[in-house]
């Protein structure tokens, strides 16, 4: 009965365009092409609907202009290994998206890695949830003392997180990072002029990112009695030059607290 109703609509002339389209669809490849395109879109949507969807979105946002020193850490791992050698054996990373950094470090030979995520991880994928369950990654407010003993790690790497702290909290947090390190601290900070956090990120970080100049950081280190590690800095620059690596973020090397 339904077929008859469809024919009557076409024959009655109420929808002549539908009838014309129906008569031409057999000979025209347009419909087939449209179906293929729709199918491709569905497949792409399915592929991105898995646990890695949030990571893919974050990667796209970085490509479109959002700065990310955490992504820079992963690029710099070979350079850091050349500069620090055995000091890369026990590494603590502090900063947003720490799960991705910890995973990359764990893939390196003779390297143990832990992470501190300063912000919520509601969109954590299965890999990050596994690291949290194992205790390799913790969620902690870095404005307060870190839950580790002094010199627990050979090297501490911090990225992105400090750009969202006011000087009041930096005075406490940076020395605290140096306290839990035995060999050194690597600090990656955004360059002045880089894009600041978007509206959605403001609700997560609490304040826009503050891009400070290298002279500001050097003055800050001096005021907080933190000493730059010139030997490590030189080795890092030499390794970067050999590999044609140009960091997109400012990189500072600090000595641990004695």
UniProtKB/Swiss-Prot annotation:
Transmembrane segments: 30-50
Cellular component, GO, one term: endosome
Cytoplasmic topology ranges: 1-29
Signal peptide: none
SUPFAM superfamilies assigned to the protein according to its UniProt record, in alphabetical order: S-adenosyl-L-methionine-dependent methyltransferases
Lumenal topology ranges: 51-258
Family: Belongs to the class I-like SAM-binding methyltransferase superfamily.
Name used for this protein in its record: Probable pectin methylesterase CGR3
Species annotation: Arabidopsis thaliana
């Amino acid at each position: 009965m339904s077929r008859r109703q469809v024919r009557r609509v076409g024959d009655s002339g109420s929808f002549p365009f539908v009838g014309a389209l129906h008569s031409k669809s057999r000979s025209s490849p347009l419909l087939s092409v449209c179906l293929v395109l729709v199918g491709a879109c569905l497949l792409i949507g399915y592929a991105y609907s898995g646990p890695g969807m949030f990571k893919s979105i974050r990667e796209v946002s970085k490509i479109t202009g959002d700065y990310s020193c955490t992504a820079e850490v992963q690029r710099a791992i070979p350079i850091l290994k050349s500069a620090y050698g055995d000091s890369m054996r026990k590494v603590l990373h502090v900063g947003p998206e720490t799960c991705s950094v910890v995973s990359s470090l764990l893939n390196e030979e003779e390297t143990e890695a832990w992470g501190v995520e300063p912000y919520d991880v509601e969109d954590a994928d299965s890999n990050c949830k596994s690291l949290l369950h194992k205790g390799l990654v913790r969620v902690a407010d870095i404005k307060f003392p870190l839950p580790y003993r002094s010199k627990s790690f050979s090297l501490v790497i911090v990225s992105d997180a400090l750009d969202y702290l006011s000087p009041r909290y930096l005075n406490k947090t940076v020395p605290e990072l140096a306290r839990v390190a035995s060999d050194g601290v690597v600090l990656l900070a955004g360059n002045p002029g880089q894009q600041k956090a978007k509206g959605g990120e403001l609700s997560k970080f609490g304040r826009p990112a503050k891009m400070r100049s290298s002279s500001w950081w050097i003055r800050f280190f001096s005021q907080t009695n933190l000493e730059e590690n010139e030997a490590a800095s030189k080795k890092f620059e030499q390794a970067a030059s050999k590999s044609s690596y140009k960091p997109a973020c400012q990189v500072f090397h600090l000595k641990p607290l004695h």
